[in-house]
A protein has these predicted regions:
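Glycine/proline-enriched, intrinsically flexible loops and inter-domain linkers
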Residues: 2-189
Length: 189
């Protein structure tokens, strides 16, 4: 697994200045425990979506993924929108439970700006994806999860496949792995 050495895991946001800021931040913390729910503040807000300010005003606690600020969970209000690093159950637990219950009983929406998106359209789209993905492709109007494997059968990507039409697919995956997945698709064309 050479993921840690793959420069494709960094996007355009990772300028030399960003590298210096994050390297310094990590070096300063070299003997400090990192908590599972902890996000580090330096080098943030490289990219935001059009909904960023609205989310903040609605009590969003933000994280960053591949340079993009994304919602982790929502507090009741802007003043409660903070996390406290812990190895125990974090303060997000009750808020997230409430979000989950609301989606189960009502309806919910998700912003997928931090997901990678790959579109495949054409008469051979299904045949190609059936070759590079290990899962069964969905029928039109359906979605499925499908792993993308290496030639040796190791997991290369965990993807969601939406079949928009008989020969039209939208594939979602990790935003941080977008370039890595794109290379794999192109290698197998």
């Amino acid at each position: 697994d050479v993921w840690a050495m793959d420069v494709a895991r960094f996007g355009d946001y990772a300028s030399p200045q960003y590298g210096t800021i994050k390297s310094s931040e990590n070096y300063e913390r070299r003997f400090i425990m990192t908590f599972p729910n902890e996000t580090l503040p330096k080098g943030r807000k490289q990219k935001t979506t059009a909904l960023y300010d609205r989310f903040i005003n609605q009590g969003a606690v933000m994280g960053d993924s591949f340079g993009l600020e994304n919602v982790l969970w929502f507090a009741n209000n802007k003043e409660d929108a903070h996390e406290e690093p812990t190895i125990k159950r974090s303060r997000s637990h009750d808020y997230v439970a409430k979000e989950v219950q609301n989606v189960r009983e009502n309806v919910g929406a998700i912003e997928v700006a931090n997901f990678s998106k790959h579109e495949f359209i054409g008469p051979d789209a299904r045949k190609f994806l059936d070759h590079v993905l290990a899962g069964k492709l969905p029928k039109p109007g359906r979605i499925s999860l499908s792993p993308m494997l290496t030639y040796k059968g190791k997991l290369y990507g965990d993807l969601t496949v939406a079949c928009l039409g008989e020969n039209e697919f939208m594939i979602f995956g990790s935003g941080a792995a977008q370039e890595m997945h794109r290379r794999w698709f192109e290698t197998n064309l």
